């Protein structure tokens, strides 16, 4: 009789453990299904209610960055570029693609360096001006009243009035067709102290970045979710691969 009671207690304990920890055995796919609470589709054509447009740039939004460089005579220049992105993590590299017709293309080739000046929405007039006119015809700093500052680590100017700056040394470039993609290693990042949180991140409550798409500029980004709050950590790790 005593053995029977012990056996029942052991079985009850096993059942309790399975009930408490059974969810831990979920695969990432199972976790994702529970996350969205919708049945996963077995097949999808990917064309339902969509119109084929052929080859067309529908990437939106794109960052509106102002690229700083010196020409061969040492004149500071800036231009607005949206064909920009992060190219690598370690070492941290960014890329910007420019047409050979642009003045900045030749400036970067001459100096082997450039800066990335990240604008706030309050600076949109300067962003538009830098993207509309060529440095061949004028000194854009003189025309706009912006202040060029010689970078500490690379041979390129940055814009004092812009809140975030990346100093980049040119490490390689690739001719892709209409554009040359410049890859720059970031050797220093600068930010206005008022925008810096204690954890070293940008305070997005105080910073209103500019994005570009379809010939227009936009601002007013709004936080909708934190990735670590919306996706289980184990699944999150898999999504990053």
What are the roles of these predicted feature ranges?
Residues 1-14:
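N-terminal Sec-pathway targeting helices
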Residues 8, 19-20, 24-241:
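Basic, polyanion-binding surface patches
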